[in-house]
């Protein structure tokens, strides 16, 4: 009479689960970040001063904005994560706007201060 449908088990992940285009560059970047999260991160330990952690931030930045912009955003995030750097909630921006060009990667440094105000 009643059919019980097995409920799908939600996968637990700490990484970005929203929609993103699966291009070769993004897949390569995300594969490298995931490799780091599974292997090296457990040896180093969680010492990030931000939420989301730096590896989660880079994963989401690459998924949302591509390998080039996401990698630069991630590099600058790691540079901000030192003992004299910033701390607290620092999300990846949903859009970069019109002032960010691939040939000016140093502009990605300003993203955090600009979108968190």
UniProtKB/Swiss-Prot annotation:
Keyword tags: Cell inner membrane, Cell membrane, Membrane
Subcellular location: Cell inner membrane
Gene Ontology CC entries for this record: plasma membrane
The keyword Transcription belongs to this UniProt entry's keyword annotation: no
Family annotation (InterPro entries): Membr_insert_effic_factor_YidD
UniProt keyword annotation of Transcription regulation present: no
Membrane topology: Peripheral membrane protein
Xref: SMART domains: Haemolytic
Membrane-spanning parts: none
Chief location bin: membrane
Protein family membership: Belongs to the UPF0161 family.
UniProt xrefs under NCBIfam families: membrane protein insertion efficiency factor YidD (TIGR00278)
Function comment: Could be involved in insertion of integral membrane proteins into the membrane.
Protein name per the record: Putative membrane protein insertion efficiency factor
